[in-house]
A protein has these predicted regions:
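Signal peptide processing junction and immediate N-terminal pro/mature segment
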Residues: 17-31
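Bacterial N-terminal signal peptides
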Residues: 7-20
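Active-site metal-binding motif and surrounding structural segment of the metallo-beta-lactamase
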Residues: 74-119
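Positively charged n-region of N-terminal signal peptides that target proteins for export
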Residues: 1-5
Length: 303
């Protein structure tokens, strides 16, 4: 396996965060290993965004792959600017999950890069097909001019990996208990990218996983990701300033266990929210916690 040291300089702009994760020369201990030619840039729309969803540009020498397309059209346009500034040819847009904050920006990306293929796993495509009309009806009026002018359906990705300039980038989790919750693995950078299983710096969205088995499966997925010993982890959702490393895996697993423990003791959602905020007083995304707590305590149905 190719290895590379990673440098993580973060540049905060007024409207978004672009975090280049640069592949540096291999350390002397691995001097004979081929050096990775890949480089990551992350895009985050900033704290003012409706959803803190990330996008990642995986760059080779000449070509690039984009992971996830943003939610609002204005953020997607800023993402277009980042891609163009890279000077690389965008060959592929990969959508890592079927919720609208991952793909509503596709029309903007497709207009800017019409030759790029747009793909997702069969599970993600099925999720989008089943939910896109309802999601647009709900979110469209709230988004106003930021709403997508059309919805773009990804093609089903054949096989379990992407390819970039001869390097295979496998999807991890397709053969696990929850194939709809996979992530992309960049072996030469030891980087986990995209998907919904991992969160950093904000309350974890628990409303979509409502059974003990779903939480056990989730923890199993996180354990599998930890076994990869990643150097970089770019979650599908993270708060600006969060560490993009393996600590996100530990945080997510600890949060799931804490939520389960507090939900079992709490009399109602308000008590559950208080308990989780006491455990995690600095996390962003309290609105997500409040809704998740209501679902967990049977006070509302979701979706």
């Amino acid at each position: 396996m190719r290895t590379a040291a990673l440098l993580l300089p973060f540049a905060l702009a007024a409207s978004f965060t672009s975090a280049p994760l640069l592949a540096a020369p291999a350390s002397p201990a691995h001097a004979t290993a081929p050096q990775s030619q890949l480089r990551l840039q992350t895009f985050h729309p900033g704290p003012q965004a409706m959803f803190s969803v990330s996008s990642v540009l995986i760059e080779g020498r000449h070509d690039a792959i984009l992971v996830d397309a943003q939610f609002g059209a204005s953020d997607a346009r800023r993402l277009v600017d980042l891609i163009r500034a890279s000077g690389k040819q965008l060959t592929t847009i990969y959508i890592s999950h079927g919720d609208p904050d991952y793909y509503f920006g596709l029309a903007t990306l497709q207009d800017a890069f019409p030759k790029a293929r747009i793909v997702a796993t069969a599970q993600t495509v099925a999720h989008i097909q089943q939910t896109q009309a309802g999601k647009l009806a709900y979110w469209g009026p709230k988004m106003g001019s930021d709403a997508p002018k059309r919805l773009v359906m990804p093609q089903v990705l054949e096989g379990g990996a992407l390819q970039l300039e001869g390097e295979r980038l496998p999807l991890i989790g397709l053969d696990g208990p929850t194939p709809d919750r996979s992530v992309l693995w960049v072996p030469s950078l030891r980087a986990i990218v995209g998907g919904i299983p991992v969160v950093a710096g904000e309350h974890v969205w628990m409303a979509d996983t409502q059974t003990p088995k779903s939480h056990a499966d989730w923890l199993q997925t996180l354990q599998r990701l930890q076994a990869l010993k990643p150097k970089v982890v770019v979650p599908g959702h993270y708060a600006p300033g969060a560490a993009l490393d393996a600590s996100a895996l530990r945080f997510t697993a600890d949060y799931i266990r804490a939520f389960d423990a507090e939900a079992a003791k709490a009399q109602d959602s308000a008590a559950l929210v208080r308990a989780m905020r006491a455990r995690y007083p600095t996390l962003a995304g309290v609105e997500s916690l409040e809704l998740s707590a209501k679902v967990a305590k049977g006070e509302m149905r979701w979706p």
